[in-house]
Amino acid sequence: MANYEFSQVSEDRPGCRLTRKAQIGLGVGLLLLVALVVVVVIVLWPRSPLVWKGKPTTKHFADIILGRCLIYTQILRPEMRDQDCKKILSTFKRGFISKNPCNITNEDYAPLVKLVTQTIPCNKTLFWSKSKHLAHQYTWIQGKMFTLEDTLLGYIADDLRWCGDPSTSDMNYDSCPHWSENCPNNPVAVFWNVISQKFAEDACGVVQVMLNGSLSEPFYRNSTFGSVEVFNLDPNKVHKLQAWVMHDIKGTSSNACSSPSINELKSIVNKRNMIFACQDNYRPVRFLQCVKNPEHPSCRLNV
């Protein structure tokens, strides 16, 4: 048998081993790959929606919005039949979907306001504060005046709740922010402030506001009318604001037009170069109250 001598391969000999520089590069590459995988998992991993104390989005929200829009444009106001209700719905939803419901801005609803164009005739605008039901009864019977909820955007959203969540492209049907949660920039509040501002800016001629005279402060500075609408009336288009201070027909009657609260409203209006007028228990509206209380002394006609 031939004699063969086997020698040990020197560890210092270059072979298949990686250089130290290559080892470092490979290690860095692996770390980056692991980091990328972690990021992808975090992004794609389903997260639980934020939990709030308030009631959730109204069930069948999209169906209600679309249905109301069609009723309004095809039946109630056929002159607006050219409005695209499906586009209005999708634009509305984009204002709050996939967003933190406490970080909604006026700009989020700007495309919706721009999309829906509606002209309210001069002298036909009626604002209200703490008198919603009575104001709506009046415009429904009177037929020619408009509250905010008699406009298309106000009509489709009236009495609904909605919010989204940054973790999903759907609406939050579990909970939405409650007014007590220090979340003033929520989807509902911002929406009404935005369209209230537009409603006031578009008003012209003589405008009316229906106030609740049964309250200690018929004019409330923190209400939508007191904080948004009255300050967005354009004095170049509106020359007079008439306040109708309505009292509960079964309550104590008082001269609310001379109260400090109404005088504050008068001061605001006058400083903005508009005329102010006030009337307690505006008679046409009083008649509506009398329908349910026909025997009340204030409802009896002197024949």
UniProtKB/Swiss-Prot annotation:
Where, subcellularly, is it found? Cell membrane
Query: How does its record describe regulation of its activity?
Result: Both NAADP and cADPR synthesis are inhibited by nicotinic acid.
Which family is this protein grouped under?
Answer: Belongs to the ADP-ribosyl cyclase family.
List cystine links. Answer: C69-C85, C102-C183, C163-C176, C257-C278, C290-C299
Which EC number(s) does the record attach to this protein?
Answer: 3.2.2.-, 3.2.2.6, 2.4.99.20
> What quaternary structure, including any partners, is listed in this protein's UniProt entry?
Homodimer.
- Give residue spans on the Cytoplasmic membrane side: 1-21
Enumerate the CDD domains for this protein.
Answer: Rib_hydrolase
Which residues are on the Extracellular side of the membrane? 45-303
Q: In what tissue types does this protein appear?
A: Spleen, liver, heart, thymus, thyroid gland, ileum, colon, cerebellum, salivary gland, adrenal gland, jejunum, islets of Langerhans and osteoclasts.
Name the catalytic site residues.
Answer: C122, C204
Please list the residues annotated as glycosylated.
N103, N123, N212, N222
One MF annotation (Gene Ontology) recorded for this entry: phosphorus-oxygen lyase activity
Organism of this sequence? Rattus norvegicus (Rat)
State the annotated membrane topology for this chain.
Single-pass type II membrane protein
Question: Per its database record, what is this protein's job?
Answer: Synthesizes the second messengers cyclic ADP-ribose and nicotinate-adenine dinucleotide phosphate, the former a second messenger for glucose-induced insulin secretion, the latter a Ca(2+) mobilizer. Also has cADPR hydrolase activity.
Protein name per the record: ADP-ribosyl cyclase/cyclic ADP-ribose hydrolase 1
Q: Which UniProt keywords apply?
A: Cell membrane, Disulfide bond, Glycoprotein, Hydrolase, Membrane, NAD, NADP, Signal-anchor, Transferase, Transmembrane, Transmembrane helix
Q: Which domain of life is it from?
A: Eukaryota
Listed transmembrane segments: 22-44
Enumerate the Gene Ontology biological process terms. Answer: artery smooth muscle contraction; B cell proliferation; B cell receptor signaling pathway; female pregnancy; long-term synaptic depression; negative regulation of apoptotic process; negative regulation of bone resorption; negative regulation of DNA-templated transcription
